[in-house]
Design a protein with these regions (language model features):
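Single conserved hydrophobic/aromatic residue that forms the stacking wall/gate
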Residues: 1-7, 11
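Conserved beta-strand -> loop -> alpha-helix junction used to position metal-binding or nucleic-acid-contacting
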Residues: 259-260, 269-300, 304
Length: 392
């Protein structure tokens, strides 16, 4: 079959055995069966010079394409801005990104479901204990930051309840399944300044990353994600969670992060997906010292999210790491629920960040956890009937 004419009647013959080319005797087209230019479905073009982009690198979630045309207007414009001292050095231009670069994403992170629930959770039908014991487990484990084994020991020593640490873990996972949809879909009435950062935890000794996005006005955690990599994909998912109740960005919107490259790339994808309604620049606070005016002005916001990281790491440290990513997911979801709805904050006059009328009616923390589970169940029913917000 001739690849150009796509007809069976075209007889092929070897044109040059050393190079492996094939010559069609009907249309006289020479081509290679391994690398055939006629089988390409599309080719990416540079928007500045219309030159075909070259495939440069393969990343986990995207492919990097680059315009290598030395006469490209984009390249020449950037080259004129390079310091002349660097041009005189050998490979001095390599300090800058001068060529047009395009990242072709292999996964559509804007179509992934944000409401995916953890697996292997037990049911709320109690065979040995009841919801009171479950609330005790959550209070000791999440509020007081005890490990699973110390939680089981506290129930035995203080309340005389014999329970294994694995059963405590099952209760926490079940509660997380119920509570997470409520926490993720709650409308936090955000302001116009968001701040973001990432930190790491250990799963069986391997680094896993936690992404946080905070509303600077109320200091609520409005976006979070657990990922096995530090790429742009989980950053997009955390941003989607933070933006899910916004039809467009507020005026004078600021998104403050560190100098990591995933945040500007994620912002580009939001503009590509939603247009001018979600067009924003990342204000990057780089380093630990105020070396420029941007760092000096926005350093307090960066310190705010860093304190959040330390607060979470303080509760995580007692766990001595996790066995799997599901355990990290349910632990983080419960901690965010506690931080946003149950934990008193000094800067808020020792009140919770988000007042929920139903939760304020409970006098004890045990009752608050049970009501959170109830609110989560109602949110799940609303999601099943399409009444909750569409996380896009």
């Amino acid at each position: 079959l001739c690849d150009r004419r796509q007809r069976q009647m075209c007889i092929r013959d070897r044109n040059n055995g050393s190079k492996g080319q094939i010559l069609c005797k009907v249309c006289s087209t020479a081509f290679s069966p391994e690398e055939n230019r006629f089988s390409k479905s599309y080719s990416l073009k540079c928007p500045h010079c219309n030159h075909s982009l070259a495939h440069k690198k393969d990343r986990k979630h995207f492919v990097v394409h680059k315009c290598v045309n030395p006469k490209c207007p984009y390249y020449l414009h950037n080259l004129n801005k390079v310091d002349k001292k660097d041009l005189k050095e050998d490979y001095g231009k390599n300090k800058y990104k001068l060529h047009y670069i395009y990242r072709e994403f292999q996964i559509d992170f804007f179509r992934m479901d944000l409401n995916t629930l953890p697996k292997n959770a037990s049911s709320l039908k109690f065979s040995k204990h009841d919801q009171h014991v479950m609330s005790l487990c959550l209070t000791y484990k999440v509020n007081l930051g005890l490990s699973l084994r110390k939680t089981a020991q506290a129930l035995k020593d203080i309340h005389g309840i014999s329970i294994s640490h694995q059963q405590v873990a099952n209760y926490c996972k079940t509660a997380s399944v119920c509570i997470k949809p409520f926490v993720d879909n709650y409308d936090y009435k955000t302001g116009n300044v968001f701040t973001a950062d990432e930190t790491y935890i250990k799963i069986r000794g391997i680094k896993t990353y936690i992404w946080f996005i905070m509303d600077a006005a109320k200091r609520s955690v409005i976006g979070y994600q657990v990922s096995d990599n530090r790429g742009v994909g989980p950053c997009i998912l955390a941003m989607r969670m933070a933006f899910q109740h916004l039809k467009e960005l507020p005026k004078n919107f600021k998104f403050i992060a560190d100098g990591y490259s995933a945040y500007p790339l994620a912002a580009q994808q939001f503009f590509h997906e939603f247009g001018d309604k979600f067009k924003f620049e990342i204000t990057q606070v780089i380093g630990l010292t105020n070396d420029n005016e941007v760092s000096k002005e926005f350093r307090p916001y960066k310190q705010m999210i860093e304190r959040l990281n330390r607060t979470y790491k303080a509760s995580y440290r007692k766990t001595n790491g996790f066995d799997n990513i599901d355990g990290a997911n349910y632990d983080l979801a419960l901690w965010v629920a506690y931080y946003n709805f149950l934990r008193p904050h000094k800067h808020n006059n020792y009140k919770v960040l988000n007042e929920v009328e139903m939760l304020s009616q409970a006098d004890t923390m045990l009752g608050k956890w049970q009501l959170l589970i109830f609110l989560g169940q109602q949110t799940i029913l609303n999601l099943q009937h399409g009444e909750a917000a569409n996380c896009s």
